[in-house]
Amino acid sequence: ISYSPYKNGMAPLFNVKDINGKNIDLAKLRGKYILIDFWGSWCNPCIAMIPKIKKIHEENPDLIVISIAHDQEDNTLPETRKIIAEKGMDWINIYQCDREMTKPSIATMYNIYAFPTTILIETQKKIIYRDIGNNKYNELNTVIRNQCNSQND
């Protein structure tokens, strides 16, 4: 199992609005594991990963899932919203566009250089898993089950 090169490193905190205008403050999401999925509407492997994230979300009700749609071009929010609706992404969704940013994006804060990238953060905000691509669903699911089950023991 490949864990993050930042294993036990603290996750950068962010406080932003989701696509519905609700405030999302990572520091206030306490006591639960958090799965962050960095994706883009322009990224076919990202779109292929969405059903896998959805399955993880459905199978792990105590897991907080945050999908962060990251784009470099503006005017992609309508397409992002369409994908979120079509794929039934009924968890926290954040949209960020480089051209509209006045401060570093969450992707920049997390040193994301390829999409999709998936990060698992434990209850004390330490990064315990990081993976690039969409082909390690079984590994990710195993890590989540092991971590979340040990939390509930």
Go through each PLM region and give its residues:
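Thiol/disulfide oxidoreductase modules built on the thioredoxin-like
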Residues: 48, 89, 96-145
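Non-globular targeting/processing and membrane-anchoring segments
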Residues: 152-153
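Structural microenvironment flanking redox-active thiols in thiol-disulfide oxidoreductases
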Residues: 48-88, 98-108, 142
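Alpha/beta-hydrolase fold active-site loops
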Residues: 33-34, 63, 116
